[in-house]
Amino acid sequence: MKTLFFFLTIAVLVSSCTSNIMTKSILEGKTQFSIPSLSSTIDPAYEHIGHFPDDMKIIFCQQCAFHCIEKKKNIPHCENSICRCTLENIL
């Protein structure tokens, strides 16, 4: 009986530690991203942004599409910095 209790206690501890380690590694994987280096061809007026306005629209639309896909919705259009997802689900 003591052996069974000891084994179950060890199993719970190992499971808990494994869960914590996996959660930390998943969070670290999500926060790691590459930051594009600033090019010397960027207009100094846009240097604080790091992208041209057209690039910002593309990035916004990519983030909008990702957001809609996470919600399992379609993206009908992406204009004027407004992100709208459709009401119907992706098939």
Curated annotation (Swiss-Prot):
Its main location: secreted. Residues 1-19 form the signal peptide. Keywords: Antimicrobial, Disulfide bond, Fungicide, Plant defense, Secreted, Signal. It is found in: Secreted. One of its GO terms (biological process) is killing of cells of another organism. It comes from the Eukaryota. Disulfide bonds join 61-78, 64-83, 68-85. GO terms for cellular component: extracellular region. Belongs to the DEFL family. This is Putative defensin-like protein 221.
